[in-house]
Structure formats: structure tokens, C-alpha cells
Amino acid sequence: MVRFTLNGQSVSSNSPVDTPLLWVLREELKLTGTKFGCGIAQCGACTIHLDGSAARACVMPLTAVENRSETTIEGLATPAGAALVSAWEAEQVPQCGYCQSGQIMQAATLLEKNAQPSESDIVSHMDGHLCRCMAYPRIKKAIFAASRAMSGEMLGE
């Protein structure tokens, strides 16, 4: 049995220890916000926070999270997370929406470490997150909007 903290709650899993965390989240724990994209940690759809850092759940064995803290999109209850969700809607980022939870999780780690990122900071931090709808300009715009909202400015200005 593997025990860990998930979205602030103590949980355990009896899945085989080499089971990718993504499948434990989706199949056993019924948290389907974290998506399967590529299965090789190249697209970012499966991004979660592990001890506060972005991590790819599709290649992470269950045993790697034992006694650690993880957050999924369902549990992202931070100022950065709230600002990003509002900005995502205001900037009309989603098209198909498949990559969005991973994009938001990755962007949240940026804003939690750097509340006023430059364009190059955003591009560098978001590198490796694929969006098949090519919404990259809107994603970048939403991250800037979330940054402004976190500093007290209004969305859409």
C-alpha cells in the first residue's frame, strides 16, 4: 500500500507500485482532470504538482509519490490557480480543452515562483506543453492576465 497526500487529503492506493500515477488518479481515485496525452512525458497533458513542483504523472510510478504531497487540477486552490482559471475564461483560451488542465498546472508553478513573469519567462516555463489547437498566443495572454489579476489589476484591461 502506498500512502500520500492528494489535494490536501491523506489517501492510499493498493495498485501495483509501478503503476503510473496518472492511472491511479484517473481509474482508482476517479480524478479525471489530469489527462493522458502521449504517455512519454512529452506533451504536458498529465501535469500535476508534486511537492509544489510541476511533474508529469504519465511516467511517474506510484511508488515515487509515497509520503509526498501532490495536487491535481481538481485541488488547485491557490491564488495563482484561481487567477489562471479566471484568466483562461476571460481570454477564451480553451478550444478542445484537452491540454488545459496541464497548461494551468504548469502556469501555476510559474506564477507561484514569479508573479510578474516576462514573455521569455512564460515561453521558457511553458516549453514542452503541447496544444493541438495552437492556442499558444491566448495561453500566453491568459498568463499575463492572471499575473496582473494577482497584483490587483482587473482582467481584460
Question: How does the language model describe each region?
Answer:
Residues M1-E157:
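Signature of N-terminal electron-transfer/Fe-S-associated modules in redox systems
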